Amino acid sequence: MRFRFCGDLDCPDWVLAEISTLAKISSVKLRLLCGQVLKDLLGGGIDYEKILKLTMDARFESGDVKATVAVLSFILSSAAKHSVDGESLSSELQQLGLPKEHAASLCRCYEEKQSSLQARLRACSLRVNRLVGVGWRVDYTLSSSLLRTVEEPLVHLRLEVAASPGAPAQPVAMSLSADKFQVLLADLKQAQTLMSNVG
């Protein structure tokens, strides 16, 4: 069976297995868990102590707690990626065996944060790291008493790259011949044109 929140594909087996784990906690606690997972997906971090307190009644082992967070994260982010409305998501989760109250509780949380979650996912999509700064210098030796030939110019690039937003920037240095720099510049301009046509 195909599900919209899975991108019109079959639901992964591990998600099916964890639906029964979600059913072990109350719908109210599931809503609070969803709030914590959404906070994490939106970049606010996750409070594991609060999650452990919420799952204490169900006597979850640490593996069950992690699996619960993972399955909620998958369901919420995947539904947002595929622009699934709350009603459809609720229906699909019930088809997978999640009780109606639980599905309604999860979907209320999802609907409240759907647009901000989609914006966050869009901002993080296809982004390996962030360019913080660029520096460059051209060395061109006109003549030298030690060299018989005049060397071609060298372009020294220094890129400052942050692995994630808020992380300290790491310098990446490289030296290129003038020809290689021209090829790099042409490729970057072509990539910029293609990306501007996409978004």
Curated annotation (Swiss-Prot):
The alphabetical list of record keywords is: Cytoplasm, Nucleus, Transcription, Transcription regulation, Ubl conjugation pathway
Entry GO terms, CC: cytoplasm; nucleus
Q: Is the Protein transport keyword given for this protein?
A: no
Pfam families linked to this entry: COMM_domain, COMM_HN
> Any S-S bridges, and between which cysteines?
none
Residue ranges annotated for the COMM domain, each copy included? 130-199
Where can this protein be found? Cytoplasm; Nucleus
Q: Kindly list the biological process annotations in GO that this record carries.
A: signal transduction
Belongs to which family? Belongs to the COMM domain-containing protein 4 family.
What the protein does comes down to: Scaffold protein in the commander complex that is essential for endosomal recycling of transmembrane cargos; the commander complex is composed of the CCC subcomplex and the retriever subcomplex. May modulate activity of cullin-RING E3 ubiquitin ligase (CRL) complexes. Down-regulates activation of NF-kappa-B.
From the Swiss-Prot or TrEMBL record, give the protein name.
COMM domain-containing protein 4
Could you read off the lineage of the organism from its UniProt record?
A: Eukaryota, Metazoa, Chordata, Craniata, Vertebrata
Please state the gene responsible for encoding this protein. Answer: COMMD4
